[in-house]
C-alpha cells in the first residue's frame, strides 16, 4: 500500500523560483499552465475596472495572480484576481494573504475549466471564500457565486451586452464591452 505524501506551505515555499507556477491543493502540488493572451486581456480589463472602483471607494485591496492565498498549512491557491474587503485586510501580510479573500476570480482556460469548476470551487467553499466569480471568455459570461453553508449558489450572472453590477460590488455596473477583448 502506497501512502500519500502531504506537502505543507513550508514545502511549497521551498520550491525553486524557476518561473513555473504551482498551487497546493490539500497537500498535493498542482501545476498551473501559462495563461493565454485572451485570458490576460480579460483579467487585465477586469482588474482595471475593479481597481478604479476599489481605490475610489477606499474599500479594500485588489491583487492579481501570482499572489498566494494561504488557506491552510496544506492549501495555497493563486486565483487570477483576489479582492480583500476592509474586514479581512489584517490577513494581508508581506508574503501573502493568510486566509480567505472576500472574492476569488478565476478565468476559465481549456486546461483549468474542470479544476476551476470542481476542485477550486470546493476548496474556496471549504475555506470560507464568500464570493467566487467564474469568468468564461468563450461564453462571454461572469457567474457570481455566493457561499451558502458548505457550497456555492449562483447569485448573479453578467451576460449579453447590458451592464450589470455583480456582488460584492453592488454599486459598480460592469460593462461587458469593456471586459471582453
Which residues does each predicted region cover?
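Gly/Pro/Ser/Thr-rich low-complexity, intrinsically disordered segments predominantly at protein N-termini
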Residues: 1-181
Amino acid at each position: 500500500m502506497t501512502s500519500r505524501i502531504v506537502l505543507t506551505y513550508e514545502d511549497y515555499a521551498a520550491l525553486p523560483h524557476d518561473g513555473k507556477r504551482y498551487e497546493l491543493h490539500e497537500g498535493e502540488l498542482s501545476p498551473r499552465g501559462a495563461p493565454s493572451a485572451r485570458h490576460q486581456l480579460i483579467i487585465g480589463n477586469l482588474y482595471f475596472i475593479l481597481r478604479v472602483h476599489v481605490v475610489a471607494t477606499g474599500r479594500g485591496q485588489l491583487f492579481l495572480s501570482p499572489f498566494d492565498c494561504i488557506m491552510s498549512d496544506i492549501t495555497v491557491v493563486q486565483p487570477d484576481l483576489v479582492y480583500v474587503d476592509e474586514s479581512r485586510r489584517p490577513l494581508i501580510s508581506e508574503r501573502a494573504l493568510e486566509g480567505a479573500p472576500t472574492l476569488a476570480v478565476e478565468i476559465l482556460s481549456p486546461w483549468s475549466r474542470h479544476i476551476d469548476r470542481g476542485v477550486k470551487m470546493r476548496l474556496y467553499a471549504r475555506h470560507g471564500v464568500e464570493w467566487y466569480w467564474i469568468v468564461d471568455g468563450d461564453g462571454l459570461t461572469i457567474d457570481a457565486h455566493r457561499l451558502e453553508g458548505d457550497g456555492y449558489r449562483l447569485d448573479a450572472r453578467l451576460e449579453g451586452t447590458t451592464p450589470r453590477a455583480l456582488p460584492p460590488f453592488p454599486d459598480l455596473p460592469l460593462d461587458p464591452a469593456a471586459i471582453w477583448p
